[in-house]
UniProtKB/Swiss-Prot annotation:
Name of protein: Meso-diaminopimelate D-dehydrogenase
Temperature dependence of activity: Optimum temperature is 37 degrees Celsius.
Oligomer status and interactors: Homodimer.
Keyword flag Amino-acid biosynthesis: yes
Binding site for substrate: D92, D122, F146, M152, G153, T171, R181, H227, N253
SUPFAM superfamilies reported in the protein's UniProt record: Glyceraldehyde-3-phosphate dehydrogenase-like, C-terminal domain, NAD(P)-binding Rossmann-fold domains
Listed InterPro entries: Diaminopimelate_DH_Ddh, Gfo/Idh/MocA-like_OxRdtase_N, Meso-DAP_DH_C, NAD(P)-bd_dom_sf
CDD domains membership: meso-DAPDH_N
Organism in which the protein naturally occurs: Bacteroides fragilis (strain ATCC 25285 / DSM 2151 / CCUG 4856 / JCM 11019 / LMG 10263 / NCTC 9343 / Onslow / VPI 2553 / EN-2)
Keywords: Amino-acid biosynthesis, Diaminopimelate biosynthesis, Lysine biosynthesis, NADP, Oxidoreductase
Pfam family, one: GFO_IDH_MocA
């Protein structure tokens, strides 16, 4: 079996877990890791791998797994797709997904590559669950309640705001798909808390939610990467009312995001050039090995 050569682009929380997921996958080999510092002061777990500053320094890359902040995804994806290399990412600004799909779709088709976007657990695997529930109960209401837990995307967004030394953004469900954002920050010297808090609340990640910003002496003392979701739908199948569905999970956020990214990296090798979200990709393409064996096992 020819293995898929994957490059990890970005080596923060998600990148570290992508490394573990690739090491555990029977059909992948790690082409290398791209990080801003290159091989300088590289962590011990990367000693066996090529560590570079630019993906152009790696050989024979089939797919790049983007573990960068969401707001950097489009830039990196376009550069890599233009090289004819597939990309996958966990872009998580829901309102920007349609536009990103259009932008990367044109680039991917031009260069004969595949991009699968917004492939974390939400958006991502939860999107598949929502799609299935809507199909089997076409009329009704779905509520997605996140947490309580640490939001990776929101935390990264806070860290990027001027004056923030360290940050943790917690998502607290209040019910019926409405959430409260609890943001804990350490402040850099010379900045006013009120001004930094206002900048956080006006960011696109927070502007539509009830958001509370708290200054703390140590973010590390609060840190827990656990998260979860409760997803429910109450609707109608045919003409029959009161069909109720519920999906729950409690997870380590970056570990699950990483596993989903590796699954869609595999699936990217089976699609025609273009840009896809997870609801457009056959779920069986997420799995390694023989398709008929999976059909016999799962169906």
């Amino acid at each position: 079996m020819k293995k898929v050569r994957a490059a990890i682009v970005g080596y923060g929380n998600i990148g570290r877990y992508v490394l573990e997921a690739l090491q555990a996958a029977p059909d992948f080999e790690i082409a290398g890791v791209v990080r801003r510092a290159g091989a300088e002061n590289k962590p011990a777990e990367l000693n066996d791998y090529a560590v570079v500053k630019d993906i152009k320094e790696l050989q024979g890359v089939d797919v790049a797994i983007l573990c960068t902040p969401t707001r950097s995804v489009e830039k990196y994806a376009k550069e890599i797709l233009a090289m004819g290399i597939n990309t996958v990412d966990s872009f998580d600004i829901h309102t920007g997904i349609v536009d990103l799909r259009r932008e990367l779709g044109a680039c991917a088709k031009e260069h004969g590559a595949v991009s699968i976007i917004s492939a974390g657990w939400d958006p991502g695997s939860d999107s598949i669950v929502r799609t299935m529930l809507e199909a089997i109960a076409p009329k009704g209401i779905t509520y997605t309640n996140f947490g309580p837990g640490m939001s990776m995307g929101h935390t990264v967004a806070v860290k990027a705001i001027d004056g923030v030394k360290a940050a943790l953004s917690m998502t607290i469900p209040t019910g019926t798909g409405i959430h409260r954002r609890m943001v804990y920050i350490e402040l850099k010297d010379g900045y006013k808390f009120e001004e930094v808090a206002a900048a956080i609340k006006s960011d696109a990640y927070f502007v539509n939610d009830e958001t509370h910003v708290k200054q703390v002496p140590s973010v590390d003392a609060l840190l827990d990467m656990g998260h979860g979701v409760n997803l429910t739908r109450k609707g109608v199948s045919g003409k029959t009312q009161n069909q109720l569905f519920e999906f729950n999970m409690r997870i380590n956020n970056p570990a699950l995001t990483a596993q989903v990214l590796v699954c869609v990296a595999r699936a990217s090798m089976k699609q025609q050039p273009g840009c896809y979200t997870m609801v457009e990709v056959p779920v069986i393409d997420l799995l390694p090995g023989d398709r008929e064996e999976w059909i016999g096992h799962l169906v």
